[in-house]
Amino acid sequence: MLLSVRGVPVEIPSLKDTKKSKGIIRSGWVMLKEDKMKYLPWTKKWLVLSSNSLSIYKGSKSESAQVTLLLKDIQKVERSKSRTFCFKLRFKSSTKNFEIQACELSVADNMECYEWMDLISSRALASKVSSPMNPKHQVHVGIDNEGNYVGLPKEWILLLQSSSITKQECMEEPKAVIQALDFYSKQLDTTSETKDSFSFCKETLPRSSTTSYSIRDADKHHKLTTSGVTKMNITERCKPKTTIQTDKKHIIRPFIEDKSHVESIMTGKVTKVPVKADSKNTLSRRMTDRQALAMLKDSVTSHDPVEYFNVKHKLGQGASGSVYLAKVVGGKQLGIFDSVAIKSIDLQCQTRKELILNEITVMRESIHPNIVTYLDSFLVRERHLWVVMEYMNAGSLTDIIEKSKLTEAQIARICLETCKGIQHLHARNIIHRDIKSDNVLLDNSGNIKITDFGFCARLSNRTNKRVTMVGTPYWMAPEVVKQNEYGTKVDIWSLGIMIIEMIENEPPYLREDPIRALYLIAKNGTPTLKKPNLVSKNLKSFLNSCLTIDTIFRATAAELLTHSFLNQACPTEDLKSIIFSRKANTHIN
């Protein structure tokens, strides 16, 4: 039956329709409590979700609804701590000047809770009226009569104009726009000497890392030199292959490969490069560099690495160095490894050498079947750092995703092994901070390991939260984009985004420019699947456990390892088919 509510035709299921499930998306028993009447007990109600409304009935046989909410009036759906399996709805009241009210709904189990939340939030978002709303006065952003942005710093206006964020979105969600601009501008205005950098690189390229590599054609890498702000237009899965690195002049510098550096690793001959005299502005940093360099010397092998390794060819390249395949020679004992991956880093290009030291230390200490094995490291002429690690000959998960459609059993296996590695790190108070398919490697046997510890951080007893902005934005948790304190659960969010990669071949918002992607993460929170009907309830439940906005309710790695979805993981050997299928298509040995 159709009723007109505030001029909008609303479908309210009748008892007859309810019995026949006509027009009903979902229905079921819930326990209800209104926020404004917290002193009253929870009451049992029959909840019915239709295409554009949510109705509450006294019972499953009631003829008419006690309360009907328009989905477009629902402002937020979130977990609540009032009961174990409980969520809260925030909505506009139709009787009290459209003020925001709330109610809490409790259900039988966790999966049912997430299913209700997913169905309501996705349909509420789709039913929003597209007309602009008045901007919030506490956020100083607006548009004047001539269509110009007002109330923003000039630099932010330039960023906004370069992005694909619309003026209507600025009016509707000014807070999310401010958060995105503030986050992005801080990366432009801050050098890597004072903040950890982050990357909009969406390719399997090693960055300022000592541990990751991929099998790529280096000649296909794009060079990017842009002054000011560049509007990015991403139209295909083949993503930009350049890490954005910025200085105070807002210049995005290209990666220029040092030819002498390449020659040195391929031939074993190292060319000395004159070191510029220290200026007053860099003296204190150089002192820190010397200290880090001294510690590096103490932690590496002093012998000439050329005696032990026969470098074959380049595997991958990043903004800070290259990764090479090498054969172990000269009687060097590296356990079962006869082939290794060598990451060569030019330390003169690294403004924060202590980060490299931290990365090596974490990797050396993180001995686990699901973490790439660190083998050795060498410092050549106090400039080139060679980090030797096990060679994962099947490449990255990104390569697999691009060539093959994964089954849920295969996704479960990859999630299980990745969760084990994450749990190992979290148990030692280490956050990876850059979990994504690029940083999950496989070998020909189907073994799965986490790599790239360039962004990792340690938490202490006194400091169990961080606020630094690192990682790859498309995989970032909302609390990082909003610059709130965060902990180990940012890795769980990134794992959830990686699951969407495995389902849909790419993370959410990949085709958006970076500023708009940050805006959408801040605005939308939990992303929605493009075709949720093709995904099983068990996988959706696991995904929701990873992508809960409220970190209190977001699962830990240990909790995920007990989830029933992982019970359907295929044997490791079953991954061989997609590995060799991908190799056959790309002619990789």
Swiss-Prot record:
Taxonomic superkingdom: Eukaryota
Residues reported in the UniProt entry to bind ATP: L315, G316, Q317, G318, A319, S320, G321, S322, V323, K343
Gene Ontology CC: cytoplasm; cytosol; membrane; mitochondrion
Purpose: Forms an activated complex with GTP-bound Ras-like cdc42. Participates in Ras-dependent morphological control and mating response pathways.
The protein's Enzyme Commission number: 2.7.11.1
One Pfam family linked to the record: PH
Keywords: ATP-binding, Kinase, Nucleotide-binding, Serine/threonine-protein kinase, Transferase
Family the entry assigns: Belongs to the protein kinase superfamily. STE Ser/Thr protein kinase family. STE20 subfamily.
Name listed for the protein in its UniProt record: Serine/threonine-protein kinase shk2
Organism: Schizosaccharomyces pombe (strain 972 / ATCC 24843) (Fission yeast)
A GO BP entry: intracellular signal transduction
InterPro entries noted in UniProt: CRIB_dom, CRIB_dom_sf, Kinase-like_dom_sf, PAK3-like, PAK_BD, PH-like_dom_sf, PH_domain, Prot_kinase_dom
CRIB domain span: 129-142
Domain Protein kinase: 309-566
Domain (PH): residue spans on this chain: 23-125
A molecular function GO annotation: protein serine kinase activity
Annotated catalysed reactions: L-seryl-[protein] + ATP = O-phospho-L-seryl-[protein] + ADP + H(+); L-threonyl-[protein] + ATP = O-phospho-L-threonyl-[protein] + ADP + H(+)
SMART domains per UniProt: PBD, PH, S_TKc
Active site residues of this protein: D434
Enzyme class, first EC level, given as a word: transferase
Annotated signal peptide: none
